[in-house]
Amino acid sequence: MADFSYIVLDLEWNQPLNPDSAIREPFFFDSEIIEIGALRLDERFRETGSFKTFIRPRFYPHMNGDVVQLTKIRAQDLEKAPEFPRAYADFMEWCGEDCCLCTWGPDDI
């Protein structure tokens, strides 16, 4: 059995080019995850691993300029990236079973 670890998660999101074009049905969907980044820390908060994957956007495929400026993630970085289901499965496998997921804010939950 693997040792307990803390997983510190950071997500990056793309947004529609125009807020008026945000998906509203069947639910309000104003952004899409384009990167999962995480660090694994042991019980003494020492870094023991890292995870990073870009995610090819499905709903907002055109990069918002503000997002590019903030994250430095460009459309060409995402072209060959996995879509969310594959990236999520890879992340969950990397996390393992005995971990505590930590974030710095509500946008990463």
Regions found by a protein language model. Give the residues of each.
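Conserved non-catalytic scaffold segment of RNase H-like nuclease domains
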Residues: 2-109
